[in-house]
């Protein structure tokens, strides 16, 4: 009786394994059979990966990775993490991963040497304020009263002129370094950046600054879009795209974004 029970369990496990190996679009297309190898940075940073521990599934990219893997038929235990530098992964040639997630913007130049999935994130515009304006509420009414700066050649200017409509003239600068310096020197109160850049500037570059709010991505002109990076010609691409498309269609992708890039960062949508 016991032998028959054990045999039944083993048979069930074997059937499940075979079903996974041969019945899914990822079958035979990964570096290691029945495993999905995903690369992240060394280290990986908040809020994309929490505490430099992608295996926890915490952080926006870590959470997206596990949700996508599940859609592709891989349980969490079959997701393998490796580390790469940002630049080495963009180089042409064979890769030691199936997918790489390090906030890679999809660009025509990069697509010459690597493949990208459909976008899993479109970076919205966010408001970065200097230390003198950190108590500003994330509302359109309050944003109008700030002194704004922007790089003259960017879409931030039209966003400010047509959407925010500040009460004082927008100060124009040659590049982002000049805008950053102006915020640091309290020459301006605020500037617009894509959310990843704004979070980085606040955490690392501009002491006392704060990201007080973000616009929805669909309200941004030509937003920066992140894709999962793959070796050029990777046969897994269609399967990855199917999984990401389903996550987007069901609202799961938006829910992950809200959890990790709005709630966790404390950067609410501007009203």
Q: What does each of the following model-derived ranges do?
A:
Residues 38, 43-44, 55-71, 105, ...:
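Bilobed "Venus flytrap"/periplasmic-binding protein-like clamshell domains
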Residues 79-91, 135-136, 171-185:
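Short helix-initiation/N-cap motifs at beta->coil->alpha
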């Amino acid at each position: 009786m016991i032998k028959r029970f054990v045999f039944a369990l083993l048979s069930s496990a074997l059937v499940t394994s075979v079903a996974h190996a041969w019945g899914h679009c990822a079958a035979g297309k990964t570096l290691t059979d029945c495993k999905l190898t995903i690369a992240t940075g060394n280290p990986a940073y908040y809020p994309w990966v929490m505490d430099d521990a992608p295996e926890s599934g915490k952080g926006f990219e870590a959470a997206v990775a596990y949700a996508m893997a599940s859609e592709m038929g891989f349980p969490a235990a079959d997701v393998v993490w490796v580390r790469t530098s940002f630049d080495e992964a963009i180089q042409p040639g064979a890769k030691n991963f199936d997918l790489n997630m390090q906030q890679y913007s999809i660009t025509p130049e990069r697509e010459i040497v690597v493949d990208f999935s459909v976008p899993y994130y479109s970076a919205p515009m966010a408001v970065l304020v200097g230390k003198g304006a950190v108590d500003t509420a994330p509302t359109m009414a309050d944003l109008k009263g700030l002194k704004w700066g922007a790089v003259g050649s960017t879409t931030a200017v039209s966003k400010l002129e047509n959407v925010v409509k500040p009460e004082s003239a927008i100060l124009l600068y040659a590049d982002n370094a000049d805008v950053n310096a102006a915020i640091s020197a309290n020459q301006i109160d605020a500037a617009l950046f894509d959310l990843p850049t704004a979070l980085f500037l606040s955490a690392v570059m501009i002491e006392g600054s704060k990201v007080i709010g973000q616009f929805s991505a669909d309200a941004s002109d030509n937003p920066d879009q992140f894709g999962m990076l793959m070796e050029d010609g990777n046969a897994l691409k269609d399967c990855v795209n199917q999984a990401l498309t389903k996550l987007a269609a069901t609202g799961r992708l938006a829910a992950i974004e809200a959890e990790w890039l709005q709630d966790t960062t404390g950067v609410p949508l501007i009203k």
